[in-house]
Curated annotation (Swiss-Prot):
This is 3-ketoacyl-CoA thiolase. It is found in: Cytoplasm. It catalyses: an acyl-CoA + acetyl-CoA = a 3-oxoacyl-CoA + CoA. Belongs to the thiolase-like superfamily. Thiolase family. Catalyzes the final step of fatty acid oxidation in which acetyl-CoA is released and the CoA ester of a fatty acid two carbons shorter is formed. Its EC number is 2.3.1.16. It comes from Escherichia coli O17:K52:H18 (strain UMN026 / ExPEC). Its main location: cytoplasm. Heterotetramer of two alpha chains (FadJ) and two beta chains (FadI). The keyword S-adenosyl-L-methionine does not apply. One of its GO terms (cellular component) is cytosol.
Length: 436
């Protein structure tokens, strides 16, 4: 066991997660069609503050993330402060760590709490796959800049004459890695082939995810942590996630064709996360500040770790890399955990990470560790379903997972939970949380 790194303030206070909330998650171009991420962020933070009954002036910092950036609101965090009636002097800044963005936001607020610069803050993220920054071609963009500098009409017309019809076509946001040109699904296909993960195994995990998420909603386990969203023109509120397929069968999954490697692939739309809209946020405080305000925390942040690997091959192994670090810093092992919540970007990615967490060879030859991190106990793993079922608004997923895990830990009488995710760019994140 390596060095334990206690997450406490100089006064010995633990980092308390007082409450958390999210919007329902909606598939692209459905219930939240036309609602930008900044509005989803304002929606969830405003409701979170209202439900907590914490005076807005208590919140000294807001760190928020958005992966699909909108040029008109580049600092989503500050816009949320200004749009929710919070104190205008509240510090606010935005972060981005791809699919681990709200992990980063939570870590940043925790670090401010440990440094003593604040005593309470909000962290979270929002993304919309329905409101996208549609751009222009590089050639058109350059011509437009030059036209703005041109002095005469003839100069402007000459510049425009260089354009062809194809240069005028809109350019949607890139779905591939900038450095490699590989799509996430291409990487998932790599991982399925590298680790011998079959189509049947992927479909079974996806089916499990949907079944458990549907059961969680049916049992009322998510009601406290998901708000009802009222969307213009306010005719039909959205109270639950709309991606969950509770009535599907394994035979339904088998009907879908591969989405990326269409000839030999096993990754389909059904065993991958869909493009999703939504927002999530949590309130963090020092333990003593929570006591002053008479608040009972959901739980505490015990440790966190971020990692990075190469992007050319099997880059979605973030959980296999970051989990041993987070456990080490928490002074725990896999057997100490009550719950494990892993982001399901793709079923293939999830199964590959599970395999490597239990691999002695991976631990020894790749991580340089004496022993495997530990086998993943299925009875502890994604017990309420995962991202394949709920959906994945990139910047919101981490806050969803942490809030969900803490509520479930409390229902089980407390314990430790691991929350972990892969992210674009070969990044990984893991956090250990504790509930009493």
């Amino acid at each position: 066991m390596g060095q334990v790194l206690p997450l406490v303030t100089r006064q010995g206070d633990r980092i308390a997660i007082v409450s958390g909330l999210r919007t329902p998650f909606a598939r692209q171009a459905t219930a939240f069609h036309g609602i930008p991420a900044v509005d989803l962020g304002k929606m969830v933070v405003g409701e979170l503050l209202a439900r907590s009954e914490i005076p807005a002036e208590v919140i000294e910092q807001l760190v928020f993330g958005q992966v699909v950036q909108m040029p008109e609101a580049p600092n989503i965090a500050r816009e949320i402060v200004l749009g929710t009636g919070m104190n205008v002097h509240t510090d606010a800044y935005s972060v981005s760590r791809a699919c681990a963005t709200s992990f980063q936001a939570i870590a940043n607020v925790a670090e401010s709490l440990m440094a003593g610069t604040i005593r309470a803050g909000i962290a979270g993220g929002a993304d919309s796959s329905s409101v996208l920054p549609i751009g222009v071609s590089k050639k058109l963009a350059r011509v437009l800049v030059d036209v703005n500098k041109a002095r005469t009409m003839s100069q402007r017309l000459k510049l425009f004459s260089r354009l062809r019809l194809r240069d005028l076509m809109p350019v949607p946001p890139a779905v591939a890695e900038y450095s490699t040109g590989l799509r996430m699904g291409d990487t998932a296909e790599q991982m399925a082939k590298t680790y011998g993960i079959t189509r049947e195994q992927q479909d079974a995990l996806a089916h499990r995810s949907h079944q458990r998420a549907a059961q969680a909603w049916s049992d009322g386990k998510l009601k406290e942590e998901v708000m009802t969203a009222f969307i213009p023109p306010y005719k039909q509120p959205l109270a639950e996630d709309n991606n969950i397929r509770g009535n599907s069968s394994l035979a339904d999954y088998a009907k879908l064709r591969p989405a990326f490697d269409r000839k030999h692939g096993t990754v389909t739309a059904a065993n991958s996360t869909p493009l999703t809209d939504g927002a999530a946020a949590v309130i963090l405080m020092t333990e003593s500040r929570a006591k002053e305000l008479g608040l009972v925390p959901l739980g505490y942040l015990r440790s966190y770790a971020f990692t990075a690997i190469d992007v050319w091959q099997d880059m979605l192994l973030g959980p296999a890399w970051s989990t041993p670090l987070a456990l080490e810093r928490a002074g725990l092992t896999m057997s100490d955990l009550t719950l494990i919540d892993m982001h399901e970007a793709f079923a293939a990615q999830t199964l590959a990470n599970i395999q490597l967490l239990g691999s002695e060879r991976f631990a020894r030859d790749v991580l340089g560790r004496a022993h495997a991190t530990g086998e993943v106990d299925d009875s502890k793993f994604n017990v309420l379903g995962g991202s394949i079922a709920y959906g994945h608004p990139f910047a919101a997923t981490g806050a969803r997972m942490i809030t969900q895990t803490l509520h479930e830990l409390r229902r089980r009488g407390g314990g430790f939970g691991l929350v972990t995710a892969c992210a674009a760019g070969g990044l990984g994140a893991a956090m250990v949380v504790e509930a009493e």
